[in-house]
Amino acid sequence: MAKNDDKKQLKCSFCGKTQDQVRRLIAGPGVYICDECIELCSEIISDEFEEDIQIDMTSIPKPVEIKNYLDQYVIGQEDSKKSLSVAVYNHYKRINSNNNSNDDVELQKSNILLLGPTGSGKTLLAQTLARFLNVPFAIADATTLTEAGYVGEDVENILLKLIQNADYDIERAEHGIVYIDEIDKIARKSENPSITRDVSGEGVQQALLKILEGTVASVPPQGGRKHPHQEFIQINTTNILFICGGAFDGIDSIIERRTRVSTLGFGAEIQSKKDKDIGKLLKQIMPGDLLKFGLIPEFVGRIPIIVTLEALDRAALISILKEPKNALVKQYKKLFELDDVELEFKDEALEAIADEALKRNTGARGLRAIIEETMKDVMFDIPSKEEIAKVIINKDAVSTKMPELIEAENGKRTPIKLKKSRTRKGPETA
């Protein structure tokens, strides 16, 4: 009988302990694992994960390295890229200092305000930063937010996007970057507090204060409004970098009124809007100007770093079309190569595209739309027309929407060998 009992005695397949020696033994297909081995495995995984987080946070590139990477994707805005690189470096340096230091001095959080005209590169700067730092990133539109209890999105939904982009890894999300666009659209309607409820303006600013400063927020896992019978995801926003962006149309007039010297009669200097250098005016912005625009003092206090961007001129728009790593010209050439068709942009065409973007006042954001309009019919026909080997975009093509088509010598195009693209992982440090 004793021999039969020994045979029936179950053991952990990993440590060899019998079921009598452990609290619990869990069975799998042909294997067993005890509670002690499960706990040990859990500790190993947890330790490795914490090490990974620490490595990511301690290997933050220096400001020069951050700017060098931004230079590859963002044309112009030299001062803005410098300021942003320093601010981001200091943000993650602060995280490391507060995590590792026993010092009484605790470094305060500094969120960033990107201020510049439409199409100047605000969103692109934030996206490129997050990609370089290899941290989760989320974009939110401030115009969709409303104060809790009203139709629209709660501010916590911003954090849900970040959590989703971190694959629900809360610790990674807590070191991410959130870009809130159109922040100028939540300015209160007048400088004086109103007795009526401003649910999409001042109310949203009030709701954003806590997450900007740093709090443990309760986020509904499915989004939407909170209700008392659902579970929440808890996330600490203390180490999340918030970058707010907006065009702030009209703030240049506020700055000008503050900075100009009052002159009367013949000494008065009158400038038209075209003659004003709005970029220079924006560089003189002070927190008081933001208050006059309609941001509340508490909100301005939580975005202490103000980075201004200039409107892009013709030369900058032409450079954007062809110079960055993912320039639009390069993207469209690759698209055509996938159909074994060569695409050529003449310099005169790039100039015409830039001029059209300036006319529309859309900045870099409008360049893609103009190219799409120019090549819509060609992109529709090319896959079906095997005889077309090359497409040339010249100045006339931008206005007539009729690019020059060149047929293959033998009546059928030959395959184009595509270069293999190299994907980049993690931050590139020197």
From Swiss-Prot:
Q: Which Gene3D superfamilies does the UniProt entry name for this protein?
A: 1.10.8.60, ClpX chaperone, C4-type zinc finger domain (6.20.220.10), P-loop containing nucleotide triphosphate hydrolases (3.40.50.300)
Any idea which UniProt keywords this protein has?
ATP-binding, Chaperone, Metal-binding, Nucleotide-binding, Zinc
Q: Which CDD domains match?
A: RecA-like_ClpX
- In this chain, the stretch annotated as Disordered covers 409-430
Q: Which residues form the ClpX-type ZB domain?
A: 1-53
Which residues of this UniProt protein bind ATP? Answer: 117-124
- Top-level taxon in the UniProt lineage: Bacteria
What residues bind Zn(2+), as annotated? Answer: 12, 15, 34, 37
Q: Which GO terms describe its cellular component?
A: HslUV protease complex
Q: Name one GO biological process term.
A: cell division
| Cited Pfam families | AAA_2 (PF07724), ClpB_D2-small (PF10431), zf-C4_ClpX (PF06689)
Any one Gene Ontology molecular-function term assigned to this protein's record:
zinc ion binding
Q: What PANTHER family is this protein classified in?
A: ATP-DEPENDENT CLP PROTEASE ATP-BINDING SUBUNIT CLPX-LIKE, MITOCHONDRIAL (PTHR48102:SF7), ATP-DEPENDENT CLP PROTEASE ATP-BINDING SUBUNIT CLPX-LIKE, MITOCHONDRIAL-RELATED (PTHR48102)
Q: Which family does the entry's similarity section mention?
A: Belongs to the ClpX chaperone family.
- Subunit info? Component of the ClpX-ClpP complex. Forms a hexameric ring that, in the presence of ATP, binds to fourteen ClpP subunits assembled into a disk-like structure with a central cavity, resembling the structure of eukaryotic proteasomes.
Query: What role is this protein assigned?
Result: ATP-dependent specificity component of the Clp protease. It directs the protease to specific substrates. Can perform chaperone functions in the absence of ClpP.
Q: What is this protein called?
A: ATP-dependent Clp protease ATP-binding subunit ClpX
Instruction: State the organism named in the record.
Output: Clostridium kluyveri (strain ATCC 8527 / DSM 555 / NBRC 12016 / NCIMB 10680 / K1)
Name the gene behind this protein.
clpX
